[in-house]
Amino acid sequence: MEQNEQPVFGIEKLYVKDLSVEVPNAPEIFLEREQPQVEIQLNTGGRAVGDGVYEVVLTVTVTAKMPEKTVFLVEVGQAGIFRIQNVPEEQLEPLIAVACPNILFPYAREAVSDAVSRAGFQPIVLQPVNFEGMYMQRLQEQAGAPAEVPIQ
């Protein structure tokens, strides 16, 4: 195999593509003593931006609510530009859906924690995420759950 045919996977750039913080009920919300319910949503997406160059965005949305009130909403779009070349077609999607988000996640976690604390709240520490499991689940959903065959 020639040098230019070797598989290439590299990080070109990491950056925050989107950062949004909302505290719609400030300052009154800071007087509340009740613990809010925290909901975390993750989404990943990727697109080609050049020959063998892909942008992958990991979006983390954290919403803290009390009954009938939003405490805060933080959304971080942590992005990266990745060079992926000479990789078999069947390996490209798993790289974009699993490997790239695994690289982006620590940066997104730090951005979320920082944004929440700068908004005046205790930092949120995001637990590690199984992106491979999320990818496999999405593949199963796209393929449709296999019909169960009764055992006789």
Swiss-Prot record:
One of its GO terms (molecular function) is unfolded protein binding. SUPFAM superfamilies: SecB-like (SSF54611). One of its GO terms (cellular component) is cytoplasm. InterPro entries: SecB, SecB-like_sf. One of its GO terms (biological process) is protein tetramerization. Belongs to the SecB family. One of the proteins required for the normal export of preproteins out of the cell cytoplasm. It is a molecular chaperone that binds to a subset of precursor proteins, maintaining them in a translocation-competent state. It also specifically binds to its receptor SecA. HAMAP family: SecB. This is Protein-export protein SecB.
